[in-house]
Amino acid sequence: MAERNTLLIVDDFEFNRLMLCDTFNDRSVIEAENGQRAIEEFERHKDELCAVLLDIMMPVMDGFGVLEYMVKNGYIDDVPVFIISADTSDKSLSRAYDLGAADVIAKPFNIRFVRRRINNIIELYNQRRHLRS
């Protein structure tokens, strides 16, 4: 089984995407600026993806739309989704976790801790995939 090493980073602000790309420079990265583009990139690269880093508030399609798509199509168990958003209301947090998000990370964030949290959960998903195969 090939090791997945590609992140899909989805945020409408280029600066946020660049900061996360720089943080995860040891991995391949695919970027998307809205939810619709995220779904297109996800479908194209789903067998390579180790995680999706997903903003909530975006034009065209928001992050919840992407998360719902992943749940509907059965992808949520294979690829961890991290919500990275300034919207940390109880309603948004509940919705994210209810839909199967692996973690919710509030903006602004400490990049060192975000890297550690994301890498730890990616490793757990990798181990789970390995045990299932």
Predicted region positions:
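His-Asp phosphorelay/catalytic-motif detector in bacterial-type signaling
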Residues: 47-50, 74-80
